[in-house]
Each structure stands twice: as structure tokens, then as C-alpha cells.
């Protein structure tokens, strides 16, 4: 799997393209919302996995790390921010430098709702489509 990911990142680089790399999808972190799971991450496992990925791709200059995976970072009693903090820290530790990171929220929302003050977040991301059956203009 990762050999194929390596090839795609390198191919994109030859065309001067950036890759938005999502380390995991949201249902692997929290299944209480939607998706089939299984939930496989704890903050500790997320940090280790992040370190693995950061080390593997430390030489790649065409990556934007996108944490999240179509989920709110906080939903009812579920707060996944500590897990995303751990994964972000692992990526940076593995890479040996601060990497460019954002968060993919659920449709019709911005990551700023839950994560705007997070030190690991470099810029907010907005998913404008398919949120509650309508597109959301970025300026709303």
C-alpha cells in the first residue's frame, strides 16, 4: 500500500502538484457519527502512526497533511481533539520539522468551529458541499 502511495506522491511532484494526504478517515477515530469503522486509534496509536508517516515522507516537499476525515472534531460528548493533536505531533516529530497541516471537517462546516486555536493547525479548511443536502457558500 505505502509503496503505491510513494509512487503517487512522486508522480505528482514530477508535475509540480501537491498532494493532500489524509492519514486516516474519520470513522477510524470515532464511529458514533457515521461510517463503518472499525475504530482503531487512541491518542497513543495516533502519535505512533503519525511518527511513522512523518518519517516516511520527511523528504517529500509536496505534501499538505489533512487530518480529520469528514468529521467534526467535537460532537456531543465525543471530543477527538486530543487524538488529532497526538497525530499532528507524531507527524512533525517523525518529519523532524513542522509540517503544513489542516483538518477536513464534515460537509457545510469549517475546521475553525473546533480547531481555530489549535497550535498544530496551519489553516482552516471548509467543506462546502453535501452538508445537510445543500452547498454552503464559504462566506456564510
Predicted regions located by residue number:
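Extended polysaccharide-engagement surfaces of secreted carbohydrate-active enzymes
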Residues: 137-140
